[in-house]
């Protein structure tokens, strides 16, 4: 069912080195919206309505009073993004690991859904998954 007024999602995550993070994600095929990108933030485009704001730790602290999570020892969350095929899952994760990311989990095949995950250079956990459209109920 189409949403009348789709909401835009901006996921904000802190990064230690903005240039390194942007280069990493550009290497995975993502682009950045220059309107919301500067020396303190990179607006990575996931879709027409989904974005990931890579914020320098200093900029991130302007939005939250809580301590920034040490991703070497703690999970702050799990970012899951869908792709069009199992092959795209494998390709994206392999590229992530060869361009500065780290292996997070082994591939998981549930038949109707397949996923694999990596850690970006700042330790954020990314799950890349494919789901068989025939198994997704329309609401």
Each model region followed by its residue ranges:
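Residues in well-ordered beta-strands of folded domains
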Residues: 53-55, 80, 129
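Vicinal oxygen chelate
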Residues: 2, 7-16, 44-45, 67-139
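Charge-dense, helix-prone N-terminal extensions
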Residues: 27, 31, 36, 71, ...
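A short, acidic/glycine-rich surface segment
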Residues: 60-67, 136-138
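Core segments of cupin and vicinal oxygen chelate
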Residues: 12-60
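N-terminal beta-strand motif that seeds the catalytic metal site of vicinal oxygen chelate
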Residues: 1-22, 78-81, 132-139
